[in-house]
Amino acid sequence: LAFKNFRETEPFINDLNYCIENKLFGPSFLKFKESLIYANPVAINTARGHKPNDLKMGVKLLIERTFTQEERKIMVSNIQKSYFYEKKYDLKFLNSLFNDLDDKIIDFYLNDKVSYYTVSSEDFANSFKSEINNTALNPKLGKKIAIKDFIKKILNDIYRSNNPDLNKISFGYSEDDKELVNAIIDYIKKELLFIYPNIHFVIYDNSNNKTNKIIINNY
């Protein structure tokens, strides 16, 4: 049963509804919510084996059940502003984005700007065949691959934007497993800082049910 809950859609949604109803949010929930409201690029990087679309359904549920109407309006406005600033899509699309229903705008953002990495899933294994060897047995490797892939996505969008500024990139990562926290810190210091020297990395260590903020950069 535990393994089914780790992979199947219905138990995941049921668990999420239970947590929402009982306000059982993790230490980084407000930071996650803030990132969505500001329409930032976001990644969910988990050892779960669900399909990525299950996680998207979960994020939509969080928005529907935990955001106020005012927070939703601010989020929609920020989504529109971010796409207009980036010039990622043509003017016709941008005009349609400004005139569409709020739910459709949020859904587009959740498809385009939010990445869902379920590192124990078949989807993940198929997407990163050349880089992994049974990542389901090694979530550490899977999470490292996901982090690197997400950073590449962010940088590609920045390079395409009207005014790329690589000195203002901040990457935050939240983790509640101490062993994984240490592994990701080590990975950033030994590899990612050399590849991306201008990125400001922030690790939120939630391993003791409270948040310890760790900053890693070359500044």
What are these regions (language model features)?
Residues 42-46, 170-176, 202-206:
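Extended hydrophobic secondary-structure segments that form protein cores and membrane-embedded regions
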Residues 35-40, 54, 73, 159-168, ...:
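Short helix-terminating capping/connector loops at secondary-structure junctions
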Residues 117-118, 123-149, 153:
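Alpha-helical scaffold elements lining the catalytic groove of polysaccharide deacetylases
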Residues 143-179:
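Conserved Lys-Pro-Asp/Glu-containing loop-to-beta segment of HAD-superfamily phosphomonoesterases
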Residues 9-12, 72, 147, 151, ...:
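Short amphipathic alpha-helical segments that mediate assembly, nucleic-acid/protein binding
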Residues 165-167, 179-219:
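Asp-based, Mg2+/Mn2+-dependent phosphohydrolase catalytic module
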Residues 1-131:
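Alpha-helical substrate-recognition element adjacent to the catalytic core
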